[in-house]
Swiss-Prot record:
Database matches in InterPro entries: Acyl_Trfase/lysoPLipase (IPR016035), LysoPLipase_cat_dom (IPR002642)
Effect noted on mutating S122A: Loss of function
Protein name: Putative meiotic phospholipase SPO1
Gene name of the encoded protein: SPO1
Mutagenesis / variant outcome for changing I103F: In SPO1-1; defective in sporulation at 34 degrees Celsius
Gene3D superfamilies associated with the record: Cytosolic phospholipase A2 catalytic domain
Amino acid sequence: MQKLLFVFSVLLTVVLATAPFQVQCPSSPLIREAKHELCPEETLYLKKKKIKTKNKLIQFLKSLTEAKFSSKFYKRVLKDPPKIGIAISGGGYRSMLVGTGFISQMNDYGLFEYSDYIAGLSGGSWILMDLVVQNFEVKSLLQEWDLEEDLLLGIPEFDISEEEIVTNAKKEYNDNDLKMKKRQGGSLITSSSNFYEQIEEIMNSIEEIPEDYMITKRNLNPLARLKKIFFPNNTFTGTDAKIETFKKVLDFYKSLHLKIKPKKMEGFQISFTDYWGKAIVQRLKKNFDDDPNHSFSFSKLVNSSKKFKECSVPIPIFVANCKNGLLSNVIFEFTPFEFGSWENILRLFVKLPYLGSKIVSGKAEKCINNFDDLGFITATSSSIFNNVLIFIWNLASQSSREAMKALNMVMGIFGLGKEEIFSISKDSSRLETDYAVYQPNPFYLYPEKDNVLTNKNHLYLVDGGEDGENIPLRTLVIPERELDVIFVLDSSSDIDNYPNGSKLKRIFEKLDEENVHYQFPNNVKTFTHPIVIGCNATKRTGHDSFLPIIIYHANANHGNASNTSTFKITYNQSEVSSMLPTGRGVFSNDYDLYYKNCLGCILTKRTMDRLPRKKKFSPFCLQCFKDYCYS
């Protein structure tokens, strides 16, 4: 027992080093009202980056032997270089692996470091975390990931589309009796009878709930079907081995609890997303949580990166959705500089290092650092996996009396014990911990902003793709960023785990409501090649700048099938080796030399559009626009 307490004490000392802590508040305001400008730090970074990387584009253009650009053309581009963004969709490891190949090919062309922004959500956000961990060295991506170990220990692989997960997410519970039954399903099982019989009883109680009443995102359906995977024949053979496996699973989740505890001890609300964040970080071979001298703060990691300090890499942007009230498709973003939203309902930002501070009416009362944990932010953007964690907690906490007591004791410390999870609270102020909880809300009671984002002292954030907006495009399209071209990689699972363009269409419909008009290519049957949208020099409504050109790339079979399930949580080396070339093929159009040359025309089109003279493009570029631009 003493040895166990000693180990616990040592581990707790280590993880406390990464917990949020109080600091002295700065004299300058922490909240910025976003009127029509970027924050000063972002503006300065882009100004320095333009000087640092503009020659990379010239090098790429000079490598294009068919386009034959002139020296006069190069001078124009150097004088007014295009601004480029990258948007990586969700899709679990599928998105991360295809996306890694995608930006690796960009890097080979010299276009990755030239780009100004890279935005990711859900599985795409894992690429951003990897980039930050690897000091933005594209060639080092995936080296720290242990892809052969289960991402969530104890959960088998299954194939459910993101669309199926979020289909009924907006439904509300109206039947309290049914709700009570759902939450109490199996929760009173505490006897020491056969362990697997208890699990079976729990699963049966879950399946008794009428299908029409189930909320797929926020309860155990469709995860109840995993019973068939755990127990395909309804038989429980090899009990000793299974109990040993379960102990391993339990140890895994206990370790997550231990790493989350310091945040709770500092008085912060804990949610399932905290555990999910630690689970993601544990899949890194170098466990940063075990290094007492290493902060995993997003702002600190990025701003200590050599390449980022040199202003030679794109700014990473994590995207999440807000669920306060009945909001939908209200997006928030995390950059290394600030956190907030460009949505008209808010347009406020807080300096990222001070996220977690108590700020009321725009004035700082207690300042915190280290709340911006990179794992937590990544998990927030990819919290569609929360339902998997909910499943494992229900499975584990209803096991044998000994295991249940051990787990319930640890969970109770965080306010996530059996009683809290399975009971109906009459306290309306109680927070929904299956969302990512950001409390204190930095925008609480902000003057002249009385709405659901400011009248509560918490923000609920969820997977960036939960409302069907699975591509982080809108955060890049805003006029303040003045982008000319956006590379989009869509690895959504619309049909057979391949995208069909529906996510892009949904975003265009949302943009249309904001007077930002793109025409969706309805006459395109398949999305196996890049499609260039918005080539025509269309100016924004109410602005003097042009809308950015969107180069849409869809994950497709480029010699290797890449339609693995979003919830496939292990990949062996052979599988990884087959996915990465797909991403390269998607970006390069299967290494098509003509397309590569045309890319030079497309990337510089807005630069030429801004020239006053009408005759601007070479015959070669005009043919490229005809071949690839959708109008």
